[in-house]
Amino acid sequence: MRKTKIVCTLGPSTDREGVLREMIQAGMNVARFNFSHGTHAEHKARLDALKALREELDAPVAAMLDTKGPEVRLKDFAGGRVHLTAGQEFTLTTVQVEGDAHRCSITYGELPGDVKAGDTILLDDGLVRLTVLETSETEIRCRVENDGDMKNHKGVNVPGVRLNMPYMSQQDRDDLLFGAEQGFDYVAASFVRSAADVRELRHVLDQAGSRMRIIAKIENQEGVSNLPEILDAADGIMVARGDMGVEIDFAEIPLIQKNMIARCVACGKPVITATQMLDSMMENPRPTRAEITDVANAIYDGTSAIMLSGETAAGRYPVESVKTMDAIARRTESDINHVKRMAQMAGGRNRLSVAAATAHAACTTAQEIGADAILTVSQRGTTARLVSRFHPGTPIIACLLDQQVRRQMALYWGVEPIMMPYASSTDELVDFAVQAAAQAGVVHEGDLVVVTAGVPVGVAGTTNMIRIQQVGGALVNAVGIGEKKASGPLCICRSTDEVAEKFQPGDVLVVPYTTNELLPYIRQAAVITEEASVECHTATIGLALDKPVIVGAAGAVQRLTDGTMVTVDCARGLVRAMP
């Protein structure tokens, strides 16, 4: 199970027949809708397609609405584009004009009052740099510092200058209301500068009755400086390296990224690393070596998710981009020592709440007993979030009651969200969670799981219970000698003669007891015996020969069926039927 999640941007490339289905099957966890482009009708058509596929495939893919935010853009040029030459003058105006090589209208009418002579203005993520020469009430006269082509609606950035524009435009408000009506799961709030911006956005969502969770996009120095308060107010963070790399000295970006990821991991909130992660795959079927390393380093740092933008929205290889992300993530995660990482994370913490301490105890318990999964049960996903915070190596299965919460959990590191029925008691809760996980195929008969939840049942935010449970009933639950495993068909014998007649190399030998006469067979087999003592002949021989042995399996000769394919797990003293 891949632990790092993949966010993919939808667009014209994903509209092609079958592409969205293949992206989901390749591992897309969150679908991002960029509301800086496209109409509500276009976004609704893509969302409807996503809804149909996630129902058909039972895939909890979250839908994320990415707002335009308080950004400044150029308006239109005659012919759609112009060429700017170093040394020429170029004017940005708040008056509505048809743009040409000498001037163009901008979307923010107060920009001339916010900048002054000597300020730098960057167009199209820094492709063209302008120096402000003078300003008037409606115009900013600039000098072009380098050659470049400029197209309609490209971004305008003013590094180091605080713009006095309101955070939420009418367009953003309309987009949020549309998203609430259509059932989006997340909103990625662009250009968040302070906690007040997050609170303003949350107020609009609350008024609309929406349960969308807010991911604050950090894209400028003000957002970076106010990260602690923003992180406290938001549900998660996006390291939006595109505009950040324009607004802030590019040499600072790696340090800022690492710090932001570390802060999010420490408080247990999801963090998305975004922008140009596999940018070359817009045109090429394979990534560059630098891109591979960029993705891997974000995963090593602990990012919850990695994001594809133009690679999937407008690139030539959207499905291949998702598969590439998936492959890099899986290989990188296989190199991480999760036990060591979890110990380091716990060691550097202040006093934990009861809920967080319970979640940490569930992680350490799962690690120490070699559990196959941690099952978290909660109404809003809080328990899963608390467990995910510690980045355990054990798979986290979030057992949930609500489909939207299930989709929202798709963004959290290491969490596999599934549905379960409502439980009215603690015993019922544990049983229902284990049954739901088994039916979903994420745990199997005989697996050992750690279940954590809140008691009393139905009270949110009360994670305080841990229980160890075995999935289903094992064929044998006895005492294992050593820690070896073995698989094979059962060979049930009641005497030495019967062993000599029936036994084949690779069989799992089941006998009432063993003697030295059976040594030639024991050397070739795993052994299950009814002898009860850990100092019995079978246990002694098993240790001496380093063979898998189960002792104390009362009634095994009578209860088990000849030829059944089984797995013998000595560490847990279990014998379970193979699927």
Predicted regions and their residues:
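Non-catalytic helical/linker scaffolds that mediate oligomerization, partner binding
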Residues: M1-P579
